[in-house]
């Protein structure tokens, strides 16, 4: 079984990755979907995280240009989820190269209602009862601060 980490770069997926490594859970691949529209601090965070873990984070690019999609479809929303569709499509294509696989998703214990009971997905932070607050504190204690983004915003990825 291939273990693939889906890394948004935010506090929850970062904490999940670091905790999995700390708990010696096998990590085969780490994928980050680079929209090209992320905060510069987020890209710096991904670079720093890559150095910290001493391994590669695969950076996936969108199939379509986001500026063109935005012009065509407008803001991504709950009803019009073109951004999510691009991200999921790219990540699923990557994962499907490594069947059988388990995809690890960084939903916190606070977000457990978002979980879909689908085979092939694992939500360690929910299993470990790690809240969003716990995840942020854990990351900050490890020296990850996203250049202060979490001081300004609740969500950064």
Which ranges hold each PLM region?
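Nucleotide-activated chemistry modules centered on ATP-dependent adenylation/adenylyltransferase
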Residues: 1-157
């Amino acid at each position: 079984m291939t273990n693939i980490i889906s890394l948004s770069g935010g506090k929850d997926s970062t904490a999940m990755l670091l905790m999995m490594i700390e708990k010696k859970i096998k990590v085969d691949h780490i994928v980050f979907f680079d929209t090209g529209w992320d905060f510069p601090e987020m890209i710096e965070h991904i670079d720093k995280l890559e150095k910290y873990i001493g391994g590669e984070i695969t950076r996936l690019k969108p199939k379509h240009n986001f500026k063109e999609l935005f012009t065509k479809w407008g803001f991504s929303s709950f009803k019009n989820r073109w951004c999510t569709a691009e991200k999921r499509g790219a990540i699923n294509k990557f994962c499907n190269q490594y069947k059988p696989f388990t995809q690890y998703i960084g939903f916190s214990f606070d977000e457990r209602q978002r979980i879909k009971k689908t085979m092939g997905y694992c939500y360690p932070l929910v299993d470990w009862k790690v809240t969003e607050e716990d995840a942020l504190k854990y990351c900050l204690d490890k020296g990850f601060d996203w250049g202060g983004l979490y001081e300004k915003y609740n969500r950064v990825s």
